[in-house]
A protein has these predicted regions:
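Flexible phosphate-sensing "switch/lid" loops adjacent to ATP/NTP-binding sites
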Residues: 1-212
Length: 212
């Protein structure tokens, strides 16, 4: 059984993908058979594996960092925006239809969860380390019931979670505290560390916030 670690963010674009990529490379250099995993990705541009399956490009970069070929199990669900609040759903590398956001979250996402579980089981059996990436924020209370990419995955795998915030855009501390407060106690227990990304300058200016 593979060991697992997960990166989640206080929002999109806080640096989850690049930190996952970096960790894949570090673990690869340490000699671990490592694989990236993101249950559900939203991206307009995809990559086609040598088996003809579409997956998100971020997982392709992470696979390269881990020294392996990209496979569909790294990203079983890909959402490709088509406009008008709808997306083409790509399941296990193949398009299965176009759904509105409401249709997907209320009728389809939990159906896709079976393939997510199958993908995780495959990776668990064939690798030593799984670097898991979340999406958006785990504290989106309006989407939580049908979540298949953040805390549902963390609880399913019991992966230690590191929460990332981007201090460069401001509001990092508030976003960290707000995210933690919106999590359920058993979810909060899975958070093992906080990453304040893109910090520059004198660390002493940050210390009062760290001891808050």
């Amino acid at each position: 059984m593979a060991k697992k670690i997960m990166f989640q963010g206080t929002s999109s674009n806080v640096g989850k993908s690049i930190l996952c990529t970096a960790l894949c490379r570090i673990l690869y250099r340490m000699g671990y058979k490592t694989v990236p995993f993101k249950a559900q990705n939203m991206a307009l541009n995809s990559y086609v594996t040598k088996w003809g399956d579409e997956i998100g490009r971020a997982q392709v970069a992470q696979a390269e960092a881990a020294g392996i070929d990209p496979i569909v199990q790294m990203n079983p669900v890909l959402l490709k925006p088509t406009g008008n609040q709808s997306s083409q759903v790509v399941l296990m590398g193949k398009p299965v239809g176009v759904y509105s956001a409401k249709e997907y979250h209320t009728h389809y996402s939990l159906t896709a969860l079976d393939k997510v579980k199958e993908s995780l089981a495959f990776l668990d059996e064939n690798f030593e380390m799984i670097v898991i990436e979340g999406a958006g924020s785990p504290a989106e209370v309006n989407l939580k019931a049908n979540d298949i990419v953040n805390m549902r995955i963390a609880k399913m795998t019991q992966a230690p979670v590191f929460l990332i915030a981007d201090i460069d855009r401001g509001g990092a501390i508030a976003s960290i505290v707000g995210t933690l407060e919106l999590l359920e106690p058993e979810e909060r227990d899975l958070i093992k560390g906080i990453v304040i990304n893109k910090f520059r300058g004198d660390i002493k200016l940050l210390e009062p916030a760290l001891t808050f």
